[in-house]
């Protein structure tokens, strides 16, 4: 064993060894308990960032730990390779997205290997490869056959200068990112998958996911947004037509004083023909794409359509207004407005001087709606036949009346909308549909799949190459001319089923091999960022249920246990340019002055430019505060980087980057190396002889086995990896303070070092593999079993008892571990320092905590 720890040399040795031996190749073995550990696959953007490193280190630690538990572990890796950034990079670098993507994959794969991650590379997949996306296309055609897919008009961002559809990210302050033109909202036909058909099951099955963070389950529940209410019909005065509204508060129906419709509602569009003010308002609303969150905070505006609606119960007329807070895509595009009992309706009514009629009051206090709406549930009044009814009774009574008069019904609604999967981009999976000359649309026949995306293309940044090339779209169907759909799939499609494809990635005659899929699925542990809590995880759960219903998998859910790792933060610095814009400077180019508490007082670039410290924020390109993992691996070694990632913070919380803490990780590993070197330098080690051990030796072994028990629980059950590492550090401190004079001292140290290498092996695998070897072990640490706790070592022959008199420490006694109160009391009373404070006094009370404390109360 060499004296100095050389991470580069050791890491290269074992990475080569693992690669050549395919040490992490997984095969189905029904005789062993399987464990499928998966980290969310990366987008191949160019190089790994520290968020990736944290995510993948956590996954690798769990995988290696489970392998040492004797399980058959699969940990695959692949590439979420389609998407807009590749198009943007291709335009910028005047290249095709495919080449850029494959180059990035090659580089990032090298980085992953340098970090020692134990992936089964034989299962590697990239979603941009036809052998992957052909099955996505095939499955989509099956969904079409089952009537789970439809096409309808939907709104997109349209750049009128570039004549192209823009992704939300390409709209900057309402303008196209390239042309600078004001972006319009345009309706075009798009494909949708009926996720709403599974809304109830997606909601119900969240209860099965008891190993998911409650925060994620709550976010999904809210996104699905189940509500129970009443749908009722309002007739339009003087017309044959009627329209429906949905409400969760039918108890307030007698307080409706106006109805609000979306700017794109047929009634609004009809009224706008003869009303220039309304027409201008509708146009303004059309060109503003709003999320629900923005609607909640924006100024409420509207225009009277001039139409009146007939109240379904009172028969009274109420005005119909067009309002900017009603969206055509939600419900019927019309809402009943009860300003006395809804704050948004209240603000609108106040602004436009509309009637406010109160119909609900608190049970035991006076009603006051002078400054805001009363939105709580209460008792009906001024509501005719519903007076005196509470919420529940009024709900039922209103529903019963509407149903009897054929004007409404009870209904369950979901906030969840069907999944729009069309994208007007190039770098994605072509949607496998054909347009025929008679206007009909049919799926591409199975024997013509995949519809291959051409990779050798020129990107002009304006229009998708497959939309620009009429020859690409031309094809035939049953001998008739046809054209291919030129839209591509939302990239969430690829990431919705990749976890299942890993089970049989080479399968070329089926989407999944059911036998293999049912052996490995569900994923036992999934790791990824909280930002994917809703869309990716919800779409993936939906896709899994589709796979199940097509007989491809047996289980109901894709991911059994979920860990959402925290972000990686770093210091951020900037100065303001002449226009007041922020110019962000990399922390490595900044020199700082700090106070005694480490707080930054002043900062400047190395050439003297004063900069402002912006605190810690998420590592990002925009703030130029990312740390290149490659630089850290080269400087400190992969094991030090991995150790820092697992020790600096609990896995599910934010991690603050610190170069000095990373140096501390390297120091710790050097210390472990030195303890092993000094130990081995003394020559051969005797076997443990438990019977001959002194109290001090028994105590040290007890500490060792307590540590094994704690680390096992911390990693295996609690997933508090940082406290597991802290326990090993404490044990090492005790080992270094213990003299190794005798044969048995060294035998215990040998046992401890072997245990420590195993305990740390999932976290710092390279150094532990080397130490395990030099400590005389013939098997590879990869295949070594996790250390077991020697229960007999935990049994204490004696205990240290604290003796207090009137709450003050007077003695510490070593007594037999099973000593009863009488024995401990007798020994304590003979102690000189105890008797000094009890002689001549009356003992009023004795408090005894077995094995810990004796407190004598005397006066």
Curated annotation (Swiss-Prot):
Catalytic activity: tRNA(Leu) + L-leucine + ATP = L-leucyl-tRNA(Leu) + AMP + diphosphate
Pfam families: Anticodon_1 (PF08264), tRNA-synt_1 (PF00133), tRNA-synt_1_2 (PF13603), tRNA-synt_1g (PF09334)
Superkingdom assignment: Bacteria
Main location class: cytoplasm
GO cellular component terms listed in the entry, alphabetical order: cytosol
Keyword Signal: no
Alphabetized GO MF terms: aminoacyl-tRNA deacylase activity; ATP binding; leucine-tRNA ligase activity
Segments carrying motif 'KMSKS' region: 618-622
Compartmental location: Cytoplasm
E.C. designation(s): 6.1.1.4
Motif 'HIGH' region location, chain numbering: 42-52
NCBIfam families associated with the record: leuS_bact
HAMAP family per record: Leu_tRNA_synth_B (MF_00049_B)
UniProt similarity note: Belongs to the class-I aminoacyl-tRNA synthetase family.
Protein name per Swiss-Prot or TrEMBL: Leucine--tRNA ligase
Organism: Psychromonas ingrahamii (strain DSM 17664 / CCUG 51855 / 37)
Gene this chain is encoded by: leuS
């Amino acid at each position: 064993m060499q004296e100095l720890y050389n991470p580069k040399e050791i890491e290269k040795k074992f990475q080569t060894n693992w690669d050549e031996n395919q040490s992490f190749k997984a095969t189905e073995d029904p005789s062993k308990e399987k464990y499928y550990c998966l980290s969310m696959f990366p987008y191949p953007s160019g190089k790994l960032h520290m968020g990736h490193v944290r995510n993948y280190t956590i996954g690798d630690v769990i995988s290696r730990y489970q392998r040492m538990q004797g399980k058959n572990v699969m940990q695959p890796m692949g590439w979420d390779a389609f998407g807009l950034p590749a198009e943007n990079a291709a335009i910028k670098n005047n290249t095709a997205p495919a080449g850029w993507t494959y180059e990035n994959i090659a580089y990032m794969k090298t980085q992953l290997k340098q970090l020692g991650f134990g992936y089964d590379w034989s299962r590697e997949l990239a979603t941009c490869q036809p052998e992957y996306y052909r099955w996505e296309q095939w499955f989509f055609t099956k969904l079409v056959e089952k009537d789970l897919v439809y096409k309808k008009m939907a709104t997109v961002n349209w750049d009128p200068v570039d004549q192209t559809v823009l992704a939300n990210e390409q709209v900057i302050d309402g303008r196209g990112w390239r042309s600078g033109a004001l972006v319009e909202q345009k309706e075009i036909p798009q494909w949708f998958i009926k996720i709403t058909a599974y809304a109830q099951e997606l909601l119900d099955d969240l209860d099965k996911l008891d190993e998911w963070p409650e925060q994620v389950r709550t976010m999904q529940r809210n996104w699905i947004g189940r509500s129970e209410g009443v749908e009722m019909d309002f007739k339009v005065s003087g017309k044959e037509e009627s329209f429906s509204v949905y409400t969760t508060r039918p108890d307030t129906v007698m307080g409706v004083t106006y109805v609000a419709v979306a700017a794109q509602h047929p009634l609004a569009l009809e009224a706008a023909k003869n009303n220039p003010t309304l027409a201008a308002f509708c146009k303004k609303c059309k060109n503003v794409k709003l999320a629900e969150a923005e609607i909640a905070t924006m100024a409420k505006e509207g225009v009277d359509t001039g139409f009146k609606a007939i109240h379904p119960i009172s028969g009274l007329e109420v005005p119909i207004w067009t309002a900017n807070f009603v969206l055509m895509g939600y419900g019927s595009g019309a809402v009943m407005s009860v300003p006395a009992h809804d704050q948004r309706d209240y603000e609108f009514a106040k602004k436009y001087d509309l009637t406010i009629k109160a119909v609900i009051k608190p049970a035991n206090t006076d009603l006051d709606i002078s400054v805001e709406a009363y939105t709580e549930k209460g008792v009906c009044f001024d509501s005719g036949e519903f007076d005196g009814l509470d919420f529940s009774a009024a709900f039922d009574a209103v529903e019963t009346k509407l149903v009897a008069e054929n004007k409404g019904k009870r209904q369950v609604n979901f906030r969840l909308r069907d999944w729009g999967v069309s994208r007007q981009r190039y770098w994605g999976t072509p949607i496998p549909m054909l347009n025929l000359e008679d206007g009909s649309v049919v799926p591409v026949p199975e024997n013509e799949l995949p519809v291959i995306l051409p990779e050798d293309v020129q990107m002009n940044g304006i229009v998708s190459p497959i939309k620009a090339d009429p020859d690409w779209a031309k094809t035939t169907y049953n001998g008739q001319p046809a054209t291919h759909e030129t839209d591509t799939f939302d990239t969430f499609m690829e990431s919705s089923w990749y976890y299942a494809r890993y089970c049989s990635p080479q399968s070329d005659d089926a989407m999944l091999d059911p036998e293999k899929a049912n052996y490995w699925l569900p994923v036992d542990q999934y790791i990824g960022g909280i930002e994917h809590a809703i869309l990716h995880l919800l779409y993936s759960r939906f896709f899994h249920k589709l796979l199940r219903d097509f007989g491809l998998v047996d289980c109901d859910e894709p991911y059994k246990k979920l860990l959402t790792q925290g972000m990686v933060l770093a210091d951020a610095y900037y100065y303001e340019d002449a226009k007041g814009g922020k110019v962000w400077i990399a922390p490595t180019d900044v020199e700082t002055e700090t106070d005694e508490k480490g707080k930054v007082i002043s900062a400047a670039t190395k050439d003297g430019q004063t900069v402002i410290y912006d605190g810690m924020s998420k590592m990002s390109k925009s703030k130029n505060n990312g740390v290149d993992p490659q630089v850290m691996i080269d400087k400190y070694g992969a094991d030090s980087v991995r150790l820092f990632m697992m020790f600096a913070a609990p896995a599910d919380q934010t991690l603050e980057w610190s170069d000095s803490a990373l140096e501390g990780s390297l120091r710790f590993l050097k210390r472990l190396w030195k303890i092993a070197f000094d130990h081995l330098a003394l020559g051969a080690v005797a076997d443990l002889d438990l019977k001959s051990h002194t109290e001090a030796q028994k105590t040290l072994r007890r500490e060792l086995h307590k540590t094994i028990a704690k680390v096992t629980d911390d990693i295996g059950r609690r997933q508090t990896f940082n406290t597991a590492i802290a326990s090993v550090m404490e044990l090492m401190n005790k080992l270094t303070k213990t003299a190794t004079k005798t044969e048995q001292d060294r035998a215990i140290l040998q046992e401890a070092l072997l245990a420590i290498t195993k305990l740390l092996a999932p976290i710092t695998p390279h150094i532990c593999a080397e130490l395990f070897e030099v400590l005389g072990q013939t098997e590879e640490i990869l295949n070594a079993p996790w250390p077991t706790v020697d229960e007999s070592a935990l049994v204490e022959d004696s205990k240290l008892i604290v003796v207090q008199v009137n709450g003050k420490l007077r003695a510490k006694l070593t007594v037999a571990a099973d000593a009863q109160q009488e024995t401990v009391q007798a020994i304590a009373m003979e102690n000189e320092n105890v008797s000094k404070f009890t002689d001549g006094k009356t003992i009023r009370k004795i408090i005894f905590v077995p094995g810990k404390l004796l407190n004598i109360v005397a006066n």
